A protein has these predicted regions:
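Active-site loop/oxyanion-hole signature of alpha/beta-hydrolase fold enzymes
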Residues: 13, 55-97, 264-267
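Short beta-strand/loop motif that positions the catalytic acidic residue
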Residues: 212, 218-220
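Conserved alpha/beta-hydrolase catalytic His-Asp/Glu region
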Residues: 130-132, 150-211
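Short alpha-helix in the alpha/beta-hydrolase fold that links the catalytic acid
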Residues: 173, 205, 228-237
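Flexible "cap/lid" loop of the alpha/beta hydrolase fold
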Residues: 110, 116-148
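Conserved HGGG/HGGXW glycine-rich cap/lid loop of the alpha/beta-hydrolase fold
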Residues: 21-64
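Acidic catalytic loop of the alpha/beta-hydrolase fold
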Residues: 223-227
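Catalytic active-site module of serine/aspartate enzymes centered on a nucleophile-bearing elbow/loop
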Residues: 242-274
Length: 274
């Protein structure tokens, strides 16, 4: 993904995590989900570099960060985020998170004590139960999937990711999402992160949602086929004062279906805390 450079490296538990910091102004942190990378913000983050100091990174085991054989679960990603916030010297940034990134920022806030000035959650993994039939099957057969022939992997990954996007995305636009999961290290990493999915990591934080200490807005694609919009409305009911905005004509990966809706929501929300 040469068009999405992450030029800086943070060492976490002996492994390399790639990140970028751009712009000047109040700190704004973007956190991606699975099976994606910080590339999901490529149509959104650049818009804010004239008004904010924008931070984004690839989770451990994802994108341009090290694809380790060890723990890349939700149980470690909040520890990584907490350490990164300290490395960046951020005490109370605005935070935007999608999918597993939502679980990560919620855990860092509620379990690691990290404070945010505001929090925007986009189709987050936050309420149990979660996990598609494909995820459940892979969890039971990780070794078999990790050893699939390359041509089958090249069919599975695009089909899986397309399920998160409502529009008919061209192959060249899909490629940056697919490429990190190809080849021996990438294929093993793809099934490793699925095999390590465990609902206990969301259960550990779920009961604490009423104690969230910052303003929250929740954005949800109306046509999300991975996590139904009803889960988003249920999440809103657990967080006092949370705003909820349904995004029309968008699936789970709202960043690809309706990036302008995310930008507009942030432009409405963030100035209240400037």
């Amino acid at each position: 993904m040469t068009d999405w450079p992450l030029a800086q490296t943070f060492r976490f538990n002996g492994h390399s995590v790639r990140f970028a910091v751009r712009g000047d102004g109040p700190p704004l942190v973007f956190v991606h989900g699975t099976p994606f990378s910080s590339y999901v913000w490529h149509r959104i983050a650049p818009y804010f570099i004239t008004t904010h100091r924008v931070h984004y990174f690839d989770l451990l085991g994802y994108g341009q960060s090290d694809k380790i054989e060890g723990d890349v679960s939700l149980g470690v990603q909040n520890e990584l985020l907490a350490r990164l916030l300290e490395h960046w010297g951020l005490d109370c940034p605005d935070v935007v998170a999608h999918d597993f990134g939502g679980a990560t920022v919620l855990r860092a806030h509620l379990l690691n004590g990290k404070d945010y000035r505001s929090l925007t959650l986009i189709d987050p993994v936050a309420l149990t139960p979660w996990g598609s039939p494909f995820v459940q099957h892979v969890r039971q057969h990780e070794a078999a999937f990790s050893g699939l022939p390359d041509y089958i992997q090249r069919a599975i990954v695009p089909a899986y990711i397309r399920g998160a996007i409502k529009r008919d995305i061209p192959d060249d636009e899909l490629a940056p999402y697919v490429q990190p999961w190809l080849g021996d290290p990438g294929q093993a990493a793809f099934y490793r992160q699925i095999a390590q999915m465990d609902e206990r990591y969301t259960r550990e934080a779920e009961g604490l949602y009423p104690t969230i200490r910052c303003p929250v807005q929740i954005l949800w694609g109306e046509d999300d086929q991975w996590i139904p919009i009803e889960r988003g409305r249920a999440l809103q009911g657990m967080i006092p004062g949370a705003q909820f905005h349904a995004i029309a004509n968008a699936g789970h990966l709202v960043q690809e279906d309706a990036p302008e809706a995310i930008v507009a929501a942030l432009l409405r929300f963030l100035p209240f805390f400037s």
